[in-house]
Amino acid sequence: MAVSEAAPSSSSNDDFSWRLLEGANIHARREHARVALWPSTGDRARPPPPKRSFLDIDEVETFARDHGIKKNTLRLCYRELFRRGQSTFEHTPDVSARDMKLLKENFTVCTSEVVETKTTEDGSGAKMVVKLHDGKLVETVVIGHSRSKDGDESNGGAGAPRAASDGGDVEKDGKVFRNTVCVSSQVGCAMGCTFCETGTLGLLANLTAGEICEQVWHARNLCGKTGVRNVVMMGMGEPLDNYEEVLIALRAMTHQAVFDMRQRSVTVSTVGVPSSIRKLADDAPNVGLALSLHAPTQELRARLLPSASGTAHTLGRLSESLKYHRRLSGRGAMIEYIVIDGVNDSPTHARDLGELVGRTLLQDDESEVAGSNSLGGEGEGKGKGRRRREQSGYFVNLIPYNPTDVGSTHGYESPADEALERMAAILTEEYGVKAKVRWSTRRGREV
């Protein structure tokens, strides 16, 4: 399905606006990472596709440099795809026969294909099964949101996984529509979260930057005129364990000549790899960050997320990396918290979570607030402490657990609506922490 032509955004997503991402440098980092990761992922055994992905801008730019193809030629080809809504670059005007022959022989828009699509009953969400060139499968989810012009949101629901963005929405019948696409970064996952089916697979392969971007391309085609407003890397895999490929994919998504999304419209979700969170702050500070926290204490978190049990991944180290990211990005991370009945949904858990997020925020702002060692504590009015917290940029997403086969082996069950509402109320009213329940997850069971 062709996507209607749109004017370039005013986001200034120039390809030279990223820190440390000049062509040859990022290409060298990528090749080094691939060699280092081969023993753990089996990527050495993945056969190359017959043609490379044209959505992998590092591959395209490197090929162009090596073969004397000018950057403007690439811009013309990408314009054919993203501005004129064509499904191929092969008929781009004003490109020499020699250059087009080289590009056609070596690249295709997509190396993957959608082999299954399941849609929710109300049509506002969908899950695509994407088959990679070597037969491996990943999942990509599209979540639709609508709101009235006065801001009341429906379908997606409050707290739906979306990045902050001020890009253009589609308006119809007094409502504003937007789509968020949730993409995978790996086949399988090494994190082993006890409630997640993907973790039972282990890590099978890292996706290339092109394969990550192709999921967004498939989603654009599925969404048609409404297009894709936001991208969240919350699908299969741990994005920060496939760092260089994810970084190149982020660059393509926000590249003015390619997907042209605002950097703040793209969010990377992580279970918490402190060293890589710092790297992301250095390399792409304007991209959103979401932390899959899921527990307010180290002991409980290590039980739910085995990857959090090491000394390098403690809550203390994680807090320091979050503060570093906030200093460079100017905004706090979104805190993802899957709520499981009887495991992490009590008022005590909610208050521990409020204290944890509160301490993190205070430590980040302590130079601005003298004479206080606790949020809303002695010497500070409750209202004043709440206002500072609300301005911090941190946001807690309370996500109802969706039953899975692996979760059932641990006796995990979905929480009651009352428990979710109580947790949100405690965080908001007692701690001044912004918190919402992602009710759309209930709807996500359909797909």
Where are these regions (language model features)?
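C-terminal accessory regions of radical SAM enzymes
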Residues: 424, 428-447
